[in-house]
Amino acid sequence: IHFTKLVKVRVSLNTPYISFPQRVPKKWKYHWVCKNKDVNPKYPIYVVSKNRGDSRLTIKCLERLNIPYYVVIEPQNYGEYKVVIDKKKILVLPYSNSGDGVGRSRNWVWDHSKSMGFKRHWVMDDNIVDFHRLYGNRKLPIGDGGMFRVCEEFVDRFKKFGITIKSLNR
């Protein structure tokens, strides 16, 4: 504890490493913002998470962009998430520690989305720091939910899309 106070770095049991001096996050001069009136996605966004209540990378990003979402967790993680996330945004799976991986959770999300009357939905991992768009030969972070809305409107033009994947580049 004394060491972490000395170097001014928060360390938890899940911290794989620390950097000293701390890295300064890149400050972007520009953001890509959608020009449409309604920039929020029309389909629900689900973030499937397990044991990452301390980091919540994707959730922090979506909240910064004012994009509505649901976080899908197992019952044993509820206490960890309820103190930092609005309870209306938390969906608790009906099972815990199934050992089946994320596939069973994604199937549950699919059923939940269909029961709410949606024909599509977004499913994201819980380790996404930011979303970017390549525009004018420059990589720009997005400033609102317009990117999701544009993708939805593109996919909705076609009838035979079963699954659509937005690429993840790190």
Regions found by a protein language model. Give the residues of each.
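Conserved alpha-helical elements of sugar-nucleotide-dependent glycosyltransferases
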Residues: 54-57, 105, 150
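N-proximal low-complexity "stem/linker" segments adjacent to membrane-targeting elements
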Residues: 1-64
